[in-house]
Amino acid sequence: MRNFPVPYSNELIYSTIARAGVYQGIVSPKQLLDEVYGNRKVVATLGLPSHLGVIARHLHQTGRYAVQQLIYEHTLFPLYAPFVGKERRDEAIRLMEYQAQGAVHLMLGVAASRVKSDNRFRYCPDCVALQLNRYGEAFWQRDWYLPALPYCPKHGALVFFDRAVDDHRHQFWALGHTELLSDYPKDSLSQLTALAAYIAPLLDAPRAQELSPSLEQWTLFYQRLAQDLGLTKSKHIRHDLVAERVRQTFSDEALEKLDLKLAENKDTCWLKSIFRKHRKAFSYLQHSIVWQALLPKLTVIEALQQASALTEHSITTRPVSQSVQPNSEDLSVKHKDWQQLVHKYQGIKAARQSLEGGVLYAWLYRHDRDWLVHWNQQHQQERLAPAPRVDWNQRDRIAVRQLLRIIKRLDSSLDHPRATSSWLLKQTPNGTSLAKNLQKLPLVALCLKRYSESVEDYQIRRISQAFIKLKQEDVELRRWRLLRSATLSKERITEEAQRFLEMVYGEE
């Protein structure tokens, strides 16, 4: 693509592509994909896009913007990279250069993370005013899209549009061509604005590019942090004291807004888990909340440097003490006691969960593990197949009624995306589950087959919508004007839509 625009400082690459479409006067999403990528199947992704090798080639004449520079300076990748380990980070970079097919989101934990982001577009009015003054146009800024943290680091709460990023899989929306809201509510949670300002350097610091501590390093970092701050008793973390320190910085209202409320009575509380052995990665937001509360004098980069500086040699484990082996008579008695408990409670698991069984199991595991494992394997109960938890027939009937209501509502509307099977399912409350189990839902499958919109029908609907719009605006009808308003071209229009166009407009 010629004259591809150069990204502005802190601009998302998504926004740069949207501006390219505006500069070239391209109104068709698929045509823009053709021009930029040479591939009509690329999905417009805001935070973690792929195919960045193509963008780097478009910007080759600038002498800048290698793939890694685009990733670290014009995507949200720096918010995930420091927390997933070096190997996974490097593999994600490789995938983002080419066709990732959603693998990057899975690899970086976005899909399974408890930190969920609102997919609606958002902006900061004060930042937009600065952009217009400096560049003469507005664009989507990276620090407006901190996942689950809709706050500008400089000016506070962001303004949301009704339109979401995934409303159209292939559409790149430009901020400069979006009507800005004049009336919007103000949020007064200054704690979250301060948190956004604390996190923002993570997006811009070149030093952070090589900082990806391992899970072992994170484990040791938090253990030492608790010890240094006196938040331990003997060798145990005082989770109540940790929670108290976090609450001194962040109110329950702020934590609930981030969906990170502290459930101290639950063993699965995220704040407890982050101070235990790390078996999985935690999000940038969880780390940042702890650091800002417990390490207020350190920047986010300095905290990362401290964790990265911990070497494997400094991670030591205590050797297990060698106990005196019991005599055979003691072992025989313990064996008999365990066998009686298993028969009494009618199962190994139930026996272990009893008060005396837990102690006895631990003793045997320590002193005669081979016998315990061998005997338990011989006396395992056959696990009965669980009863089906879902009545698929009932769900099929409920879902098909929901779909029919949606389809009926769409009949009176011309202004909606193409009603494909996947789009229709997304409009239902549990569309993802329905899509994965479609083979168990014959009524839903039949409904989708009958009512999903073909390409021809979709083009005819767009022509109808364009015709009505031009008539209402009292604009002279021309074939090219109808096609342009319907975002169609002579090359892409189907035969059926072409016949409909001739019927509406007539031969030129």
From Swiss-Prot:
BP term (GO), one: DNA recombination
MF (Gene Ontology): DNA binding
Keywords assigned: DNA recombination, DNA-binding, Plasmid, Transposable element, Transposition
InterPro entries in the cross-refs: TniQ, TnsD_C
DNA-binding region: 222-241
Taxonomic superkingdom: Bacteria
Statement: the UniProt record of this protein carries the keyword DNA-binding: yes
Protein role: Required for Tn7 transposition. It may at least play a role in DNA sequence recognition. It seems to be required for specific binding to a region of att-Tn7.
UniProt name for this protein: Transposon Tn7 transposition protein TnsD
Protein species of origin: Escherichia coli
